[in-house]
Amino acid sequence: MQSIPIKNVGESRLVDPFQRQYYYLRLSITDQCNFRCTYCLPDGYQPEANKPSFLTLKEITHLAQAFAEMGTEKIRLTGGEPTLRKDFISIAESITNIDGIRQLAVTTNGYRMAKDVADWKKAGITSINVSVDSLDPKMFHQITGINKFDDVMRGIDRAFEVGYNKVKVNSVLMKNLNDKEFEQFLAWVKDRPIQMRFIELMQTGEMDSFFDKFHLSGQVLADKLLKNGWTLQHKSHTDGPAKVFTHPDYAGEIGLIMPYEKNFCASCNRLRVSAKGKLHLCLFGEEGIELRDLLQSHEQQGILQARIFAALQGKREHHYLHIGDTGVRNHLASIGG
């Protein structure tokens, strides 16, 4: 575990040595997932014996309050599959009530959406990202290991019915698996306010051979979009890393997340906390800085914020994926992607 000094630095804002400001926290609330996606957990979730439990509701609330006081405006609940937690609604309601948090998002595999999305909206979830790696039910089953395509599609429709104006859909781009569905995805968003986001496959410790076989640069899709009249949009300060393209003839949008692109890290605006309370400065970085010992009471907030600020001063300018350094991450389910 990395050791970080805890000198109290007062109400420090979340700014790193390269003057990047961090308004966005990705908070994993569980490692558990009920899907078996080929690029993430092909063998399914394997619980580790004698390991710490996931953060409690109280600990999550203390954490979110500390980040909000330091300037965080957006929190995304991730996993694993975050909606597997029985107290998911309580977690959402607690974070929604924190001053300064303007957006509360969730990334989900969508298996519970048709049933529960109305409750998510009531609890304060402002935006939803759903994973849909194929519009072909058979390919969806092959990639996810689960025969739930129709359920996920019903969930997306239900999200619009309960009042969400836009739904973001994530698809991990994989050569010779779903890359040939690009035109089908375009047709799908023609009349639907969906931001369809293609995420370039990322190398992790356990998935080197998979990466070598299936990686495809997102630039291939960017070139197609620009050639066919799509326009790159400007980002707001809380937006994620996606390059978003729009077209006057389409209700939906296309987003591309390309971590191997030059200067990808220059606009970094997010930090990550794992489901067991470790701060991660980069998806492909160190093993994490322990925060959980400072999440036990509100009186610890000042020291907690000082530790977060001190840790941020050690953030690297960029990742080293381009030279094959994936950090210590074996798979993305352990940190929420």
Swiss-Prot record:
Q: Which CDD domains match?
A: Radical_SAM, Twitch_MoaA
Gene3D superfamilies per record: Aldolase class I (3.20.20.70)
Q: What is its EC number?
A: 4.1.99.22
Which stretches make up the Radical SAM core domain? 17-243
Cofactor list = [4Fe-4S] cluster
* Entry keyword set: 4Fe-4S, GTP-binding, Iron, Iron-sulfur, Lyase, Metal-binding, Molybdenum cofactor biosynthesis, Nucleotide-binding, S-adenosyl-L-methionine
**Pfam families named among the record's database cross-references:** Fer4_12, Mob_synth_C, Radical_SAM
Q: Does the keyword Oxidoreductase apply?
A: no
* Gene Ontology molecular functions: 4 iron, 4 sulfur cluster binding; cyclic pyranopterin monophosphate synthase activity; GTP 3',8'-cyclase activity; GTP binding; metal ion binding; S-adenosyl-L-methionine binding
Record GO biological process? Mo-molybdopterin cofactor biosynthetic process
Q: In which pathway does it act?
A: Cofactor biosynthesis; molybdopterin biosynthesis
Q: Where does GTP bind?
A: R26, R76, T107, K168, R270, L271, R272
| Record carries keyword Iron | yes
Task: Please name the InterPro entries in this protein's record.
Answer: Aldolase_TIM, Elp3/MiaA/NifB-like_rSAM, MoaA, MoaA_NifB_PqqE_Fe-S-bd_CS, MoaA_twitch, MoCo_biosynth_MoaA/MoaC, rSAM
Q: Per its UniProt record, what NCBIfam families does this chain match?
A: moaA (TIGR02666)
Question: What does this protein's UniProt record list under function?
Answer: Catalyzes the cyclization of GTP to (8S)-3',8-cyclo-7,8-dihydroguanosine 5'-triphosphate.
Q: How is the quaternary structure described?
A: Monomer and homodimer.
What name does UniProt use for this protein?
GTP 3',8-cyclase
Organism of derivation:
Haemophilus influenzae (strain ATCC 51907 / DSM 11121 / KW20 / Rd)
* Organismal lineage: Bacteria, Pseudomonadati, Pseudomonadota, Gammaproteobacteria, Pasteurellales
Source gene?
moaA
